[in-house]
């Protein structure tokens, strides 16, 4: 076995390997057409996407701080976007949320050269793992559908660990899981 400087490599998934912004925008565009939001909200998808992105950031921050739960995050970001277009249909917001979470993990855009880098590191026999704040089921679907599941020994989600990055406890959880010390590991992303 080849001796490596680090015993374990940890990666973030979204915004590091999996191109969240591209995949999310493509998902929202699918929803925009599927639910005919161009007729109900605005004919300008770019404006609709910008509005959604604004509310999504606000609701994720509220979720990270513990002000709202997972279910509220999922549908209220959609509802608040619709409200900006004078649509107060809660059932539509909940449908959007369901469909968004169904469609998003089917998108497979990765950042450039990710596969090549992961293949190189695997050939060097680095044990690789993911630490992600995403939802358990959704993250595993993204990984499988993108064909990168073969690279990672452990997928550690905030939902599984019970704590979100950047809190130290999620990294301690990962170290315990891999039986490593911080000096033996490197975190890539976030």
Question: What does each model-identified segment do?
Answer:
Residues 90-91, 150-154, 182-186:
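Short acidic capping loops at alpha-helix termini that bridge into adjacent secondary structure
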Residues 10-12, 131, 188-189:
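Generic enzyme active-site microenvironment
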Residues 3-111:
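N-terminal helical cap/lid subdomain that shapes the substrate entry/recognition surface
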Residues 95-110, 114-146, 152-158, 164:
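Substrate-recognition element of Asp-dependent hydrolases with the DxDx(T/V) motif
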Residues 164-190:
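Conserved Lys-Pro-Asp/Glu-containing loop-to-beta segment of HAD-superfamily phosphomonoesterases
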Residues 2-4, 123-126, 177-184:
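Glycine-rich phosphate-binding loop signature in dinucleotide/nucleotide-binding domains
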Residues 25-30, 146-148, 174:
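Glycine-rich, phosphate-binding/catalytic loops in enzymes
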């Amino acid at each position: 076995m080849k001796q490596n400087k680090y015993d374990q490599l940890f990666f973030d998934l979204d915004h590091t390997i999996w191109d969240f912004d591209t995949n999310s925008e493509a998902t929202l565009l699918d929803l925009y057409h599927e639910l005919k939001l161009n007729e109900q909200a605005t004919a300008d998808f770019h404006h609709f996407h910008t509005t959604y992105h604004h509310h999504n950031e606000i609701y994720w921050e509220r979720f990270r701080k513990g002000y709202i739960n997972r279910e509220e995050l999922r549908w209220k970001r959609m509802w608040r976007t619709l409200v900006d277009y004078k649509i107060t249909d809660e059932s539509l917001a909940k449908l959007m949320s369901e469909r968004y979470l169904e469609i998003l993990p089917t998108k497979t855009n990765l950042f450039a050269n990710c596969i090549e880098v992961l293949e190189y590191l695997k050939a060097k026999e680095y044990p690789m793992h993911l630490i992600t704040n995403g939802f358990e089921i959704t993250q595993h679907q993204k990984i499988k559908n993108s064909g990168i599941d073969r690279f990672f020994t452990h997928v550690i989600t905030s939902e599984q660990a019970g704590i979100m990055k950047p809190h130290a406890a999620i990294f301690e959880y990962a170290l315990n899981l891999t039986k490593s010390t911080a000096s033996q590991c490197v975190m890539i992303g976030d």
